[in-house]
């Protein structure tokens, strides 16, 4: 039997997974290490008193973290999406798909994304497309997985370094059109380069109310795309962007009006709690969960993520925080580098 030739787009999806795992580092340092909670010896509560649930677009998520957009678009990534959907179902986590643009261009790849709904029929699923797509593409992406919400990713740095990437970035008006007309909530997200206050203000101006600031510190798409280039020409951009912590600082002035989500460089439950303390309503995790899945399989990954939920509850109990609102008042100190960033950007915590 002759196997059908894999498309360029499908091959790229497989390359992304391979390179994300190749460059994954469990012990990688990032700006979450520059945040320290002040220990509270008398929290005056029980662990059972702590509520870790959060609200998103009128729905309650029992966990304050979710599986962020990763993959799909090839037979290999179909298997990964099926396993991730199993993990999401067992652990009770919302889950985002990877970019579905490839399946909208090539309908033979639809099942590499729709498999998520097959394996998690009652779960909260977020569809995913790139900025620059119009309303009809957004509607097709949502229908493909019967999604509860849509992520639109903005990824100029990745596109510039990607050999076959886009070279025109007139995105804002189309984002606004989708937000105004789509039947499900829309999240606009970065892909690991962070967001500035200026970017957040522009998104707010066209009606965006949900933003994932997705900063550097984890999966690095400049490094991944540069590795795919023959000339390796953009290695000097490997540190481009704002960290997730810096991006949460940038979002401070908008947090009462917008729902801010955080992702990028999340390694453990303490990182999640720190992001929630800085104002994130929920925290997305991609690379760390993919690494767990590849190394241990779906059952052990789900068990680990259930353990993370219990550990988040325990950390909040140590801090005397009964819920996420109380957590945002927990005393915290910053490293000199983070304090310098706040000063240079005229921001406050």
From Swiss-Prot:
Assembly and interaction partners: Homooctamer. Dimer of tetramers.
CDD domains (alphabetical): IDI-2_FMN
Domain of life: Bacteria
InterPro entries: Aldolase_TIM (IPR013785), FMN-dep_DH (IPR000262), IPdP_isomerase (IPR011179)
Subcellular location: Cytoplasm
Binding positions for Mg(2+) per the UniProt entry: 159
Protein task: Involved in the biosynthesis of isoprenoids. Catalyzes the 1,3-allylic rearrangement of the homoallylic substrate isopentenyl (IPP) to its allylic isomer, dimethylallyl diphosphate (DMAPP).
Gene Ontology CC annotations of this record: cytoplasm
Positions annotated to bind FMN: 69-71, 99, 128, 189, 214, 219, 265-267, 286-287
Name of the protein described by the UniProt record: Isopentenyl-diphosphate delta-isomerase
EC number: 5.3.3.2
Gene Ontology MF, one: NADPH binding
Binding sites annotated in the UniProt record for substrate: 12-13, 158
One of the GO biological process terms: isoprenoid biosynthetic process
Organism of origin: Latilactobacillus sakei subsp. sakei (strain 23K) (Lactobacillus sakei subsp. sakei)
Cofactor(s) required, per the database record: FMN; NADPH; Mg(2+)
Reaction(s) catalysed by this chain's protein: isopentenyl diphosphate = dimethylallyl diphosphate
Record-stated family: Belongs to the IPP isomerase type 2 family.
Keywords noted in UniProt: Cytoplasm, Flavoprotein, FMN, Isomerase, Isoprene biosynthesis, Magnesium, Metal-binding, NADP
